[in-house]
């Protein structure tokens, strides 16, 4: 019987099989490696005893270097000074608003097109804010040893990488072996001490300070973006949303509460306004049913027994009014929405279903008007780069609550309640709003990152509105309008003509022998005759009655001449005339937009034959 070999069990818990395999296939370079491994194995127990302390110390060091902790005092000192935009950034807003007010578009912009313009402006303003903060903090970079080195210049210039390889001498002399070599390590102390071109590296304290400066700069840029949204819509509140009319600037008293009507931005998008109108009617209808005790909202929405909506009712009401009526910019509205979310969260164990049920209860009970347009206003006009994480979560919850309300029908209630509904209430609750009004699709259009910047870690990909092409006056539509009017002018000249009186045949022949037989309209003839009479009046100094009678007679003669020539042509080509009439009358019931290119070419050829 053959002897079987067994591998003894591994008793050391620190034994790593993968490391054993790697060490087994590694080339032996000498006894130093084995001694080093033996020394590490002997001191393994000592290292394991202090692993926890070392890991915690290293973690704290990395945490301090990568994400510096800013105190509240440092943040307040940096942001309290930023109350208004700098003049160069405020000028960008003025230019943007003035550009929107220019009548340079063929038709009024829809809310989706307007949103695309705002998002493009936000990206440009964000870049301009970064440049402004960078230029303002050029002297804020940390300098060490009186040198002119910056954070990005803290590296070795000639002693690292390929430059260190190609910088060496190719001489084969024996002394070159003893010469100190340039190190290829980025953090080599030898290269710093030996190389005169090396730049002093930043210490951990200097790196930490620079990271704090960068974090404060990012906060300043975010503050500038909030002020940008505020100032843009405050100026729109003053100048309006129509084409520029400087004489109709709105003025507000100091104590007057400014109210921004979000619906003005959606007036060119009928789908949104109609959807909002129907949703307002349905919310009001449900509120009346609840007030008349026809439905029990708490029972219908299955609110948790531990949640009582009444104690915070007035506070929630004030926040919803602030959200819908008194806030202006998207950042102000989203702050009110976040505050609403914070107040409604009773405990950490509260599920999202309980939160949605409570939010629906407050919406139906308080009845804030145009809440749908306010939610869409945030979705469209809030800077996409900022509408992430908690902001996106709060807005999505509000949209989910509104979707639940718009989908309610009378079939969702009991038969007893359906019998008590009036005709108007039954009509409102007949169908869902989405089945009656179709909004522009958002699901097929995925979020595009702003500009060419990489997406930050933690950003949530959110559906957004595609940037539709904005039609300008020099577009294809403008060309089609011009072509439309010119061709209609040509077709309008094709009219039936009455034959002249037979007594005027001799006069026509006499007149045709002296003039070229070019068909002209009566308006052209009258202009020529009036110009000729004016010339005669300037020569004689006065205009006689015979001259005016002669002009009217000449005009009548010209008209008969024109129709007479066409009559002669038509009598010669009688068969062709019938064919022409039959060919172009078949387009009598057509609209210009319905004609194809071939049919337009056919009409043009008919016109050319008529003019021959």
UniProtKB/Swiss-Prot annotation:
Record protein name field: Protein MUK1
Q: Which organism is it from?
A: Saccharomyces cerevisiae (strain ATCC 204508 / S288c)
Query: Where are stretches of biased composition, namely Polar residues?
Result: 55-66, 518-529
**Location of Phosphoserine modifications:** 67, 163, 185, 245
Q: Which residue windows does the record flag with biased composition (Low complexity)?
A: 503-517, 543-554
User: Where does it reside?
Assistant: Cytoplasm
Alphabetized GO MF terms: GTPase activator activity; guanyl-nucleotide exchange factor activity; small GTPase binding
Q: Which intervals carry biased composition (Basic and acidic residues)? A: 40-50, 530-542
Cite the Pfam families for this sequence: VPS9
In terms of InterPro entries, this protein maps to:
VPS9, VPS9_dom_sf
Renumbered to this chain, region (Disordered) spans 40-66, 494-560
Can you cite a GO biological process for this protein?
A: Golgi to endosome transport
Biological function: Putative GTPase-activating protein.
Start and end of every VPS9 domain?
Answer: 273-414
Q: Name one GO cellular component term.
A: cytoplasm
Q: Which gene encodes it?
A: MUK1
Q: Which UniProt keywords apply?
A: Cytoplasm, GTPase activation, Phosphoprotein
The organism's lineage?
Eukaryota, Fungi, Dikarya, Ascomycota, Saccharomycotina
Q: What is its main location?
A: cytoplasm
